[in-house]
Curated annotation (Swiss-Prot):
Disulfide bonds join 95-117. GO terms for molecular function: actin monomer binding. The lineage of its organism: Eukaryota, Viridiplantae, Streptophyta, Embryophyta, Tracheophyta. Keywords: Actin-binding, Allergen, Cytoplasm, Cytoskeleton, Disulfide bond. The keyword Oxidoreductase does not apply. It holds the Pfam family Profilin. Expressed in pollen (at protein and mRNA level). It comes from Kali turgidum (Prickly saltwort). This is Profilin Sal k 4.0201. Occurs in many kinds of cells as a complex with monomeric actin in a 1:1 ratio. The keyword Signal does not apply. Binds to actin and affects the structure of the cytoskeleton. At high concentrations, profilin prevents the polymerization of actin, whereas it enhances it at low concentrations. One of its GO terms (cellular component) is cytoskeleton. It is found in: Cytoplasm, Cytoskeleton. InterPro entries: PFN (IPR048278), PFN_euk (IPR005455), PFN_sf (IPR036140), Profilin_CS (IPR027310).
Amino acid sequence: MSWQAYVDEHLMCNIEDTGNHLTSSAIVGVDGSIWAQSSNFPQVKPQEIEAINKEFDGPNTLAPTGLFLGGEKYMVIQGEPGAVIRGKKGPGGVCIKKTTQALIFGIYDEPVAPGQCNMVVERLGDYLIEQGL
């Protein structure tokens, strides 16, 4: 399966048969290279990926400044140190799951709930980790 198919079929999927979908998603190498993305995923800057990787290496580096994606600021909320970063911005937010080689991004807006986004992103991330990726 191609990386684009993972984005199209597993991240941009119909969530729990509700007819709702993530706003955008991507699979990005930990080096910042884009492996696959939805058409409307923000253009992420190298320094934004560096800051995300730094947060995974040592939590609480993003909390004071916020998480930036494509210049948009998200308030960092509870995550799982070294594994998941979650951010909130207005009625939407972001979930980022780290695997061995990649970062899985899911961005959502209402009516998608934070827990639904987390489930979609983390399920794919856990699968990729099981596959050694």
